[in-house]
Amino acid sequence: MLNPSRKLVELVRILDEGGFIFSGDPVQATEALRRVDGSTEEKIIRRAEMIDRNRMLRETLERVRAGSFWLWVVAATFAFFTGFSVTYLLMDNQGLNFFLVLAGVLGMNTLMLAVWLAMLFLRVKVGRFFSSPATWFRGKDPVNQAVLRLYADEWRQPSVRWKIGATSHSLWLCTLLGMLVSVLLLLLVRQYTFNWESTLLSNAASVRAVEMLAWLPSKLGFPVPDARAVIEGRLNGNIADARAWSGLLVGSIACYGILPRLLAWVVCKILLKTSENGLDLEKPYYQAVIRRWQNKITDADTRRETVSAVSPKIILNDAPKWAVMLETEWQDGEWFEGRLAQEWLDKGVATNREQVAALETELKQKPAQLLIGVRAQTVPDRGVLRQIVRLSEAAQGGAVVQLLAEQGLSDDLSEKLEHWRNALAECGAAWLEPDRAAQEGRLKDQ
């Protein structure tokens, strides 16, 4: 089973292999993490967070998790009231057959627990008896299909037996708790008498059976009937012994119903926790990412897929991070959110030379990194390029230009992006391509 961060990585992989257009560019995220310290898995997780810049994928996974939780809540509530109602019906008469009530309360639970143990020791694949989550829903959008595939793949993992086991035990615990509450409530407000009947069992055999049944509850302090009460209880209800019989009933539910289920649930949760899988970094998709990080030289033909270096080079660290928009305000006021998986402080819009100069002075006083937003659909002029150079030189932590485009790739945008690439390269500035346009361009070239 995968934790939420690894689920996000796998979801990104599935979508990327299908040509999905993300809110963040996968290639730019890969290049941005080239010089970042950390283990390979940590960097791949961070890369997925950068690709999911608008958090849509994380929110989708969270909705699935929340939906599963509330589905369990509904099932648990139903199980509780089912157990409560069944027990209420079993104890509808004043004179109760003890063994009949006990069998009605614990019979099915004990049988299903035995079936689970048999499947466990026989190593039966429980996935054969349950439908895959991929068969429960149908969705046409790529994200929904990818989520279904993600959980279908997870369903085939060996550790799914512990997930199913923990869920089953938790629902049975709710059922048993409903039964216990019903028993306690009825014993509190009604006067019952207990008897027992048997055609085959003698008094001695019945006494022995009750002694064996009562051993554990008596050790835990529950009142239990003695041999005299057992013998006198045959076909007859005795109010004087009712408390002992009721104590044995409650103790049996606790000791032979709730306690074994609770232990089984704990075992499943522990084994589920210890069986958490790491990412399979041997998959071709991850190997391609790792090779890009290991490759120190980037071919000139792939220039638009990289984050160019500036002096000082941009290194993702804990330095203050500021974001500023040049010339005019962008329609998305949070255009900087999630860029390079960092939290950027909005410094507003620098619309004239005075505001650029003020920001330049502030940058020289604080070692901040700067994200500069410019409209990619405008032709780069000398004034804007001069402002970019001044701000990049003043940013002690480095600066990167984010080219912004309202729509996807078009012939006009492609031409203007090429002008921006040439101009920024001549200035020695780093830049990030428009996320959607960069991805559409690569898909078009494939």
Curated annotation (Swiss-Prot):
Originating species: Neisseria meningitidis serogroup B (strain ATCC BAA-335 / MC58)
Cysteines joined through disulfide linkages: none
Membrane topology label: Multi-pass membrane protein
Localisation: Membrane
UniProt signal peptide: none
Keyword Metal-binding: no
Main location: membrane
Domain of life: Bacteria
Note: Present in outer membrane vesicle formulations which are used as vaccines in human.
Keywords (A to Z) from UniProt: Membrane, Transmembrane, Transmembrane helix
Entry annotated with the keyword Membrane: yes
Name recorded for this polypeptide: Uncharacterized membrane protein NMB1645
GO cellular component entries: membrane
TM spans (from-to): 69-89, 98-118, 169-189, 247-267
InterPro entries per UniProt: DUF2868
